[in-house]
Amino acid sequence: MQVDDFIERWLGSGGSEMATAQSFAIELTELLGVPRPNVSDKDGDFLDYRFERPVTLTHTGRKRNGRIDLYKKGHFILEAKQFVSPETKDKNTLEMFLEKDAPKQTGHGKRGTSKFDDTMMKARNQADNYARAVAKEDGWPPFLMVVDVGHVIELYADFSGQGQGYN
């Protein structure tokens, strides 16, 4: 797949993170020419490169479970979100009447809004918390990626190995 084909294919994505994030990540790895994530074994062991890597988060002495959207030990944590583009077309009354009544998926909200910015920052904090959780066993990953599937890949790096300066 060529870069332009990849962009065109994913530009229209929106609404459902669960339905798009893993396919997007697999196609991105193919585009970059790197191996795909591993398949978890029957025991669900923590593989070094996998989707939905379980982690235990500890905050103020309380523990809760989480799952990293995509994790590669010693390389990165990817946290995916899915937003929708704001509609640009003005609809007339007839078009609105003829639309199906089924609700549209809105994902985490509309791109280009303050909610988009807030949610992407929360996703960045979520990835940082995941990094803190895996650092105990695996060390700090040098990269955190926050993705709005098909539209934005925000990359934060900390090469110190301390997890204190993801910028």
What do these predicted ranges mean?
Residues 163-167:
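Glycine-rich phosphate-binding loops of NTPases
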Residues 146-147:
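Charged, structured surface patches that assemble and position nucleic-acid processing machinery
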Residues 1-143, 152, 159-162:
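A short, conserved, highly charged catalytic patch centered on acidic carboxylates
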